[in-house]
Amino acid sequence: MKMFCYQCQEALKNTGCTTIGVCGKTADVANLQDLLIFTLKGISFLNLKAREVGVNKEKTDRFLIEGLFSTITNVNFDRNFFLRKIKEAVALRDEIKEDLRNKGVRVDEYKNIDAISWTYGTDADIEAISQEVGVLSTEDEDIRSLRELITYGVKGMAAYAYHAYQLGYKDDNIFKFMEKALAKVLDDSLTVDDYVALAMETGKYGVDTMALLDKANTSTYGHPEITKVNIGVRNNPGILVSGHDLKDLEQLLEQTAGTGVDVYTHGEMLPAHYYPAFKKYPHFVGNYGNAWWQQDKEFELFNGPILMTTNCLIPPKDSYKDRVYTTGVVGFEGVKYIPEGPDGKKDFSEIIEHAKRCKPPVEIERGEIIGGFAHNQVLQLADKIVEAVKTGAIKRFFVMAGCDGRMKSRTYYTEFAKALPKDTVILTAGCAKYRYNKLNLGDIDGIPRVLDAGQCNDSYSLAVIAMKLKEIFGLNDINELPISYNIAWYEQKAVIVLLALLYLGVKNIHLGPTLPAFLSPNVTKVLVEKFGIGGITNVEDDLKMFLGA
């Protein structure tokens, strides 16, 4: 069976995966994901019409964000999950049609739109249709490129909206925009210029969604504060929490209190330690390991069970597969799943009992790392930072936010961080930080040279900080600040962060280790001419370029 997927940075030969994903996704799963997205586009088209006549159901909003999130790289690999979701999507689509008919809307007028009208009899029908609706069904290379750019941005937006929703925060305008964007990528009358404008609008709603999630996280758990995080281990059994979901972590910490089981973060969960609300748990020990792609070795050594709350999951080895638990929209065939109850709560008793039977984690490193430099904390230090800039103690900031990945060429980011002059400061968020957050880069007048704002969505914090500095220095343009952008990307959440930065007017962003495979030459040319987007070359030449040497 054939597939075509080029949504992540590791797309084969920077062109696309055609038989199996570099991520481990099989062709049938890739195609089913395409069909789910296709059907969500149909649902979006219909739900916009339903909104016009006063019909909008909460379950449609939730289904949309969960469906989109499940197709992000390294979230869900389970064929049966996608078959089930597609059937649910068709049922929901038909329910919205019925609601429209009851309101007097002539739904038959839309029967020529395949995303709205396709049907199935058997699973084999679903499999067959799934092979016809993928990325390559758009023939024009530039239109295809822009449609995918927008779709991947909306996937990233959906992930952030999902996390906010889990904490009880929702903005109907964001859901409306996601539906609008997905409906418009079905519209063959739109031009390249139309889609460029829609991509910028996607960036605008990306900012709004990250702001909403920031509000959800900080209202629930307090503002991140400067925190030293232990990277060693204790002599108790433990549970390792990976992904991004703070609510799952909170529930697990509550349920493990007094059990003798320690809880550790992994990967993108590291920033949980920065929130005041999580500091009251004495059994919340520290962070274990590094970025997602090293999990095959680190999960093995951890000895205890692992809870995957979101991406990034890689296909687990048999040696530890029985210790992996998934929840939310994460899935992998043969791995245990912890569902959400009708009350929104999760019962973690099985994973806790499992942990009690396990040996303590193997120590892989010791010491501490520092983080918690989100916008509220950094703005408390604003006077000190401004003074350091004015005196020349800080000459330049480098935003090195984003994602980490497997490619050997990503050692560039470690070498780049090491080579930066001592009068520069790195601003980071996301798992890209693991390439340099354990280096001893020192400080400038007490300001650490690596300021970690948090998870990938906390790139929003970096934008807030930049806007505030622009205001303090009385500048007209954000690009007049002594800030350079050298961003590492991997999956679709990085796409919405990029579009958000472009919407905010940030120019001359450098993206690596490769430019996205889904950007056609012409679309790349537009981004270069309009926004100064660039790639990376080597540390020495790039430093000269950034520093104007």
Curated annotation (Swiss-Prot):
InterPro entries: HCP/CODH, Hydroxylam_reduct, Prismane-like_a/b-sand, Prismane-like_sf, Prismane_a-bundle. Hybrid [4Fe-2O-2S] cluster binds at H244, E268, C312, C403, C431, C456, E491, K493. It comes from the Bacteria. Belongs to the HCP family. This is Hydroxylamine reductase. The gene is hcp. It is found in: Cytoplasm. GO terms for cellular component: cytoplasm. Its EC number is 1.7.99.1. It is an enzyme of class 1 (oxidoreductase). Catalyzes the reduction of hydroxylamine to form NH(3) and H(2)O. It comes from Caldanaerobacter subterraneus subsp. tengcongensis (strain DSM 15242 / JCM 11007 / NBRC 100824 / MB4) (Thermoanaerobacter tengcongensis). PANTHER family: HYDROXYLAMINE REDUCTASE. Its cofactor is [4Fe-4S] cluster; hybrid [4Fe-2O-2S] cluster. Binds 1 [4Fe-4S] cluster. Binds 1 hybrid [4Fe-2O-2S] cluster. The keyword Metal-binding applies. The modification Cysteine persulfide is found at C403. One of its GO terms (biological process) is response to hydrogen peroxide. Its main location: cytoplasm. [4Fe-4S] cluster binds at C5, C8, C17, C23. Keywords: 4Fe-4S, Cytoplasm, Iron, Iron-sulfur, Metal-binding, Oxidoreductase.
